[in-house]
Structures are given as structure tokens and as C-alpha cells.
């Protein structure tokens, strides 16, 4: 079970490096990495220490909300979510 969780984490990291030009795919791969870490915490603590798991889950939700608002603002101001087009904008 632990090897499956580690494999899921590395698959998320691989998807992060492959799709590094699209912000939505970056956010999805980071969320999959967070979910594999949450699963690892659940296995490690065996549901005895639920407070730390809930704190980690709350931080995942806050990060996802901030990332989604960043994605919406980028698509509103710049017209797309490509990370390569951000290099062309010089302020």
C-alpha cells in the first residue's frame, strides 16, 4: 500500500514536469501529489491522530482555492493559461 502511494506521488511529480507550460495541469498535478501525501498520513497515523490530518486537509483546500483564484485572474487579465506567454509580458 505504501509503494502505491509513493508511486502516485511520483506520477504526480512526473505530470508536473511534463505539463509545466499549462497552469491548470500544474495545479492538478500538485493536487494529486497532495492527495497522495494525505493518504500517506492516513496510513502512517492509522487514524489515531485525526487533528493533524484535518489541518493538512484544510491547508490543501486553502491552497486549491488560492490557485483557482489565480487561474481565473490570469485568464481574465492575460486571456489564456499558458505559462510561456507570461515570459513575453514585461512590466
Swiss-Prot record:
Gene3D superfamilies reported for this sequence: 1.10.287.3510
Gene Ontology molecular-function annotations: NADH dehydrogenase (ubiquinone) activity
This protein's GO CC annotations: mitochondrial membrane
Alphabetical keyword list: Electron transport, Membrane, Mitochondrion, NAD, Respiratory chain, Translocase, Transmembrane, Transmembrane helix, Transport, Ubiquinone
EC nos: 7.1.1.2
Transmembrane segments: 8-28, 38-58, 59-79
Keyword NAD: yes
Family assignment from sequence similarity: Belongs to the complex I subunit 4L family.
Protein name: NADH-ubiquinone oxidoreductase chain 4L
Native organism: Rhipicephalus sanguineus
Amino acid at each position: 500500500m505504501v509503494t502505491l502511494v509513493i508511486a502516485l506521488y511520483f506520477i504526480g511529480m512526473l505530470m508536473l514536469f511534463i505539463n509545466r507550460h499549462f497552469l491548470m495541469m500544474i495545479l492538478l498535478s500538485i493536487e494529486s501529489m497532495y492527495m497522495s501525501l494525505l493518504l500517506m498520513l492516513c496510513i502512517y497515523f492509522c487514524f489515531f491522530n485525526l487533528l493533524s490530518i484535518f489541518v493538512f486537509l484544510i491547508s490543501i483546500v486553502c491552497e486549491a482555492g488560492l490557485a483557482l483564484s489565480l487561474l481565473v485572474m490570469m485568464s481574465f487579465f492575460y486571456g489564456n493559461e499558458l505559462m510561456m506567454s507570461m515570459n513575453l509580458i514585461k512590466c
